[in-house]
């Protein structure tokens, strides 16, 4: 009591202390970064390696496997996957969440250095790594277009001038340049001319290589001067290469131009990018794990004017896609919901108190508590994001509860005739322990959340600490600032016995009278009330088990990612045409703003698209509805399939799949995997719970298989190396020389002219020189036949792997899809040699489902322990916790009513309800215990008196919490799909709990009091018997 008196008697100190809390919070608010969600990025490192012309199988065995063996020794790797395609290998390492990304990068570099001696000698460069997740959507896409410059020149500008500059910006991990390739001198050989001039392909390669060299020539000097020697040993343009002498036919000179067409072109002619219906080069920008997306994008935008100055006037640099507008809009909506919640809560207080002065007290306490929280958020390294702002919105109802309980009790004493200061001191002393119990037990709910690890723990941690801080500050304000303001602001109020019987006060009075009558009736039918209570326990179990579940609500970010998968034997030109048609059809949709995409590179049959939708306020359909419409519209494109998925802020794993969820098949025997994967994929494709079912297993690519007759080769004086060199020279786009320029390096690329590679007859024109200098046709020692070959080879760990990706159609949830997959695997009788595991988000969802009930139980046990310590009782905490089953039923029924699946956000709502609804029981039970102890009342008299006297503050606190959550439940606009499940859960739980616990709590209080008395009587009788 002395502590409370200190704050009441020193209003200046109390006011300034509260002002200091507010100022620190305001400063923290201005310094807080902004983000869509708490930082939950897994440390992911992606390694790239290339060997131009190598088949996927060659890349897998000679590049991927040695690297995997070295990288697999690194500590802290959760998952290692690799994908090898034509001429390239990509290895993705997903580390434990607690692994520092920079430490991981150092370990990766050391492993790459150690494996260098195991890699093929023909690799043009060492493997390189990026600290980015290939499965993440890019944060920004820039495009380069020009009416005067070709794609090779644009690509050169993008990679040489822009990509390096952007990569240096803080927060940027990787800048991928797509839609083309670097300029190059291309040598297109004519097999007929080579035959007629008796020139081999290797003669041409050696001649070009020896004619373009760059080596130091030294210098000459005397006593006075020094001269560096510089020669014209380097050739830079196609016109410089054409006169090269490649062979002598007796006295006749054969120049390169006699046997080939030499042009200034690009390294890889089989790559194309498009944006806005015109050719474009794309700069796809990804952020580093842990980097703030909005700050990173802001830094990039700040650099754009300088970047444009580096480009010729004829080149246009545009922002094709920016991830941040919808993030900013979503946060603005949450802030609006927070403001509405504060206003509604204060309105509730005013309706009950009917006094401007009295309403001013919680109207001050709420913002002080909320604003002060920002300082703690800043010190903890948090951000202003959807979850932290939702925590503050929900906290509005919590923080006002404490002020309401104190204010209402002080007001009651003033109405009974006490002076304001006396009423303030007496009132806060009476309910101080109640407020402390309410706050500490509410904080206890979040202790298990704070101890959680993994992605879910990271998501919950920021929410829990933000809410806990707001509750802690609210507790302090309610026991200091609130009684002080009551003592000084309420002094003009005089007792008015009937003042509360007008308007809203009259309604509450009638409700209280009605409650008194119905409570007496309930006390006469205790068994029925207990039966209802037990029924709610069973209903909770049924509703939870049968509830449709998902990992995280599907967000409408206004961004879609598109993946085109075509026939495995498709040509680049056909693939480019299909991409163009797909993009034109998508761009014509009424809700689509822009489409950017590219195809080519190592995967000729694949294309990628980045689609921006119109702002949510300008379209009538959600992102998923747009996807469904486009899926139907584009389903009949022959030879190609389009897969679309919405960009999400929460995505686990490192796989770049064609759909949102993945199911991976693993086998030690590749033949077993090839046998079962098509059967499983077909079965899953027929399930109604899945859509867009596809696999990364591509083993039906067209191949021309050559078989060497080694005996004949030996007789003819030809070795396998010579034969392979012939094929590489002819068909491998072989990079045979390097052109060194001031800002970059370019290649000289040699292959047979495209007109001679249209069919298998090209092999008949191939000749190799034997050891005697004789020209031997390829057909003399080799035979060939068409076959199938893999377009990609995939590993997980060191096992062969194939990932089946899928989306979930409307009307079903992720839990439905997972159950259907597991059921199908059992029905198919898949052997133990083929193992199926969920990956990425689906895997995290499975782990979360297993821990949800444990988490809820841990929260309940923690609250029980805290309440037991506070009340020094085993029984009273059970009475207080008896309010939870009805809240659970209300929450789960509300989710069903609004057709909302049970997700992590709904789980947060359930955890909050554990803290909210027990407040009413605490208010009731605490008063009854005091009345029994000090008023010498029976248990029934005490609980009836407590129920009636505390009816008004119970209704006030419930309505405050309900109206605090109502803006979330009724929210619309950007990010509403995140806010609604939380609001629905809280509002539904509060309504059902309020309806039932006003009756069940008194009955259960009396039940446990009877148990306590019988137990005490039994102990007493035992003592007497022993005496």
Swiss-Prot record:
Keyword match Cell inner membrane: yes
GO terms for MF: xenobiotic transmembrane transporter activity
Subcellular location: Cell inner membrane
Subunit and interaction comment: Part of a tripartite efflux system composed of MdtA, MdtB and MdtC. MdtC forms a heteromultimer with MdtB.
Protein keywords: Cell inner membrane, Cell membrane, Membrane, Transmembrane, Transmembrane helix, Transport
Taxonomic superkingdom: Bacteria
Organism: Proteus mirabilis (strain HI4320)
Membrane-topology annotation of the record: Multi-pass membrane protein
Coiled coil: none
Entry similarity comment: Belongs to the resistance-nodulation-cell division (RND) (TC 2.A.6) family. MdtC subfamily.
Presence of the UniProt keyword Ribonucleoprotein in the record: no
SUPFAM superfamilies with a match to the protein in the record: Multidrug efflux transporter AcrB pore domain, PN1, PN2, PC1 and PC2 subdomains, Multidrug efflux transporter AcrB TolC docking domain, DN and DC subdomains, Multidrug efflux transporter AcrB transmembrane domain
One GO CC annotation: plasma membrane
Gene3D superfamilies: Multidrug efflux transporter AcrB pore domain, Multidrug efflux transporter AcrB pore domain like, Multidrug efflux transporter AcrB TolC docking domain, DN and DC subdomains, Multidrug efflux transporter AcrB transmembrane domain
InterPro entries (alphabetical): AcrB_DN_DC_subdom, Acrflvin-R, Multidrug-R_MdtC
Name of the protein described by the UniProt record: Multidrug resistance protein MdtC
Membrane-traversing stretches: 16-36, 333-353, 360-380, 387-407, 431-451, 463-483, 528-548, 853-873, 875-895, 897-917, 953-973, 984-1004
């Amino acid at each position: 009591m002395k502590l409370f008196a200190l704050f009441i008697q020193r209003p200046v100190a109390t006011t300034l202390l509260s002002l200091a809390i507010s100022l620190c919070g305001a400063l923290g608010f201005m310094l807080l970064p902004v983000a869509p969600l708490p930082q939950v990025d897994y440390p992911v490192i992606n390694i790239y390696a290339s060997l131009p012309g190598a088949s996927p199988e060659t890349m897998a065995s000679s590049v991927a496997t040695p690297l995997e063996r070295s990288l697999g020794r690194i500590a802290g790797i959760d998952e290692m996957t690799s994908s090898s395609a034509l001429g390239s290998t990509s290895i993705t390492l997903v580390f434990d969440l607690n692994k520092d990304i920079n430490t991981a990068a150092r370990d990766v570099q050391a492993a790459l250095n150690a494996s260098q001696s195991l890699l093929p000698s023909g690799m043009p460069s060492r493997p390189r790594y990026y600290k980015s997740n290939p499965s993440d959507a890019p944060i920004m896409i820039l495009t380069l277009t020009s009416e005067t410059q070709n794609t090779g020149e644009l690509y050169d500008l993008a990679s040489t001038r822009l990509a390096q500059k952007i990569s240096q910006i803080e927060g940027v991990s990787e800048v991928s340049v797509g839609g083309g390739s670097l300029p190059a001198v291309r040598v297109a050989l004519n097999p007929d001319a080579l035959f007629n001039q008796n020139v081999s392909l290797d003669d041409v390669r050696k001649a070009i290589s020896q004619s373009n060299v760059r080596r130091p020539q030294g210098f000459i000097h005397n006593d006075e001067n020094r001269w560096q020697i510089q020669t014209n040993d380097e050739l830079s343009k196609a016109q410089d290469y054409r006169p090269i002498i490649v062979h002598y036919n007796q006295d006749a000179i054969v120049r390169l131009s006699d046997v080939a067409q030499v042009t200034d072109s690009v390294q890889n002619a089989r790559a194309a990018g498009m944006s806005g219906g015109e050719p474009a080069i794309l700069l796809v920008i990804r952020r580093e794990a842990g980097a703030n997306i909005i700050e990173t994008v802001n830094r990039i935008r700040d650099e754009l004017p300088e970047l444009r100055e580096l480009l010729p006037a004829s080149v246009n640099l545009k922002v094709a896609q920016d991830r941040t507008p919808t993030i900013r809009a979503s946060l603005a909506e949450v802030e609006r919901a927070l403001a509405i919640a504060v206003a509604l809560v204060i309105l509730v207080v005013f309706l009950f108190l009917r006094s401007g002065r009295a309403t001013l007290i919680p109207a001050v306490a709420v913002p002080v508590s909320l604003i002060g929280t920002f300082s703690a958020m800043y010190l903890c390294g948090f951000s202003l994001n959807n979850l932290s702002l939702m925590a503050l919105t929900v906290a509005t109802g919590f923080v006002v509860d404490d002020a309401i309980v104190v204010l209402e009790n002080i007001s009651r004493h003033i109405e009974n005739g006490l002076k304001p200061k006396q009423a303030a001191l007496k009132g806060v002393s009476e309910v101080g322990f109640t407020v402390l119990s309410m706050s500490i037990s509410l904080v206890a709910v979040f202790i298990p959340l704070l101890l959680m690890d993994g992605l879910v723990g990271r998501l919950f941690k920021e929410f829990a600490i933000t809410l806990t801080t707001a509750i802690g500050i609210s507790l302090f304000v309610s026991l200091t600032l609130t009684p002080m303001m009551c003592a000084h602001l309420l002094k003009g109020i005089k007792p008015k016995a009937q003042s509360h019987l007008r308007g809203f006060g009259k309604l509450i009075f009638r409700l209280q009278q009605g409650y008194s009558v119905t409570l007496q009736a309930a006390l006469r039918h205790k068994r029925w009330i207990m039966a209802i209570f037990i029924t709610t326990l069973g209903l909770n179990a049924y509703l939870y088990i049968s509830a449709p579940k998902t990992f995280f609500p599907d967000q409408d970010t206004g961004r879609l990612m598109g993946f085109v998968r075509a026939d495995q034997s498709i040509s680049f030109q056909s693939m480019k045409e299909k991409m163009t048609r797909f993009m034109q059809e998508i761009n014509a949709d009424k809700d689509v703003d822009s489409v950017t995409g590219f195809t080519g590179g190592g995967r000729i049959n694949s294309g990628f698209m980045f689609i921006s939708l119109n702002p949510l306020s300008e379209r009538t359909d959600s992102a998923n509805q747009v996807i469904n419409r486009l899926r139907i519209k584009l389903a009949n494109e022959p030879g190609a399939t389009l897969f679309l998925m919405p960009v999400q802020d929460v995505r686990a794993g490192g796989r770049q799949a064609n759909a949102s969820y993945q199911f991976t098949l693993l086998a030690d025997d590749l033949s077993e995997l090839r046998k079962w994967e098509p059967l499983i994929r077909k079965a899953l494709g027929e399930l109604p719970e899945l859509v867009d079912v596809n696999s990364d297993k591509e083993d039906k690519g067209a191949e021309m298989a050559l078989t060497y007759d080694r005996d004949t080769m030996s007789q003819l004086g030809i070795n396998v190396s010579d034969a392979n060199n012939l094929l590489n020279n002819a068909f491998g786009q072989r990079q045979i020389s390097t052109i060194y320029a001031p800002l970059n390096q370019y290649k000289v690329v040699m292959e047979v002219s495209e007109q001679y590679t249209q069919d298998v007859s090209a092999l008949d024109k191939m000749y190799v020189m034997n050891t005697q200098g004789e020209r031997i046709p390829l057909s003399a020692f080799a035979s060939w036949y068409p076959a199938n070959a893999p377009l990609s080879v995939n590993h997980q760990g060191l096992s062969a792997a194939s990932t089946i990706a899928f989306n979930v159609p409307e009307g079903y949830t992720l839990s439905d899809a997972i159950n259907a997959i597991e059921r199908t695997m059992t029905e198919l009788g898949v052997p133990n040699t083929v193992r199926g595991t969920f990956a990425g988000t689906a895997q995290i969802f499975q782990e979360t489902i297993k821990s949800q009930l444990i988490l809820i139980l841990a929260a309940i046990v923690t609250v029980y322990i805290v309440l037991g310590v506070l009340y020094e009782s085993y029984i009273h905490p059970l009475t207080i916790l008896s309010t939870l089953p009805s809240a659970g039923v209300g929450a789960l029924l509300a989710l069903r009513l609004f057709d909302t699946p049970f997700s992590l956000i709904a789980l947060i709502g359930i955890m909050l309800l554990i803290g909210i609804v027990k407040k009413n029981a605490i208010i009731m039970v605490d008063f009854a215990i005091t009345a029994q102890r000090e008023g010498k009342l029976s248990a029934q008299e005490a609980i009836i008196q407590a129920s009636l006297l505390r009816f008004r503050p119970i209704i006030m606190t419930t309505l405050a919490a309900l109206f605090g959550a109502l803006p979330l439940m009724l929210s619309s606009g950007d990010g509403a799909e995140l806010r609604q499940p939380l609001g629905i859960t809280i509002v539904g739980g509060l309504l059902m709990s309020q309806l039932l616990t006003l009756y069940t709590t008194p009955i259960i209080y009396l039940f446990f009091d009877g148990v306590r008395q019988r137990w005490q009587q039994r102990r007493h009788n035992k003592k007497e018997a022993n005496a």
